[in-house]
């Protein structure tokens, strides 16, 4: 499944519990090299980028590594699967 499709699936299928989901991206500015973005921060997604609400932040989809559910640490989508 493409990352765009996985993001949209979570956004629409689990919208009542959307605050339980995060996207993990590569981030060179953090110690771990990873950063979690809550699904509640997502404005929209297209074929190339993830756009966040209320900011001018645009994240290239090639930086997205996984989608994770926080409540049980379940892996919803992972790059390469």
From Swiss-Prot:
It comes from the Archaea. Pfam families: MJ1316 (PF04457). The lineage of its organism: Archaea, Thermoproteota, Thermoprotei, Sulfolobales, Sulfolobaceae. Belongs to the UPF0248 family. HAMAP family: UPF0248. InterPro entries: MJ1316, UPF0248. This is UPF0248 protein SSO2687.
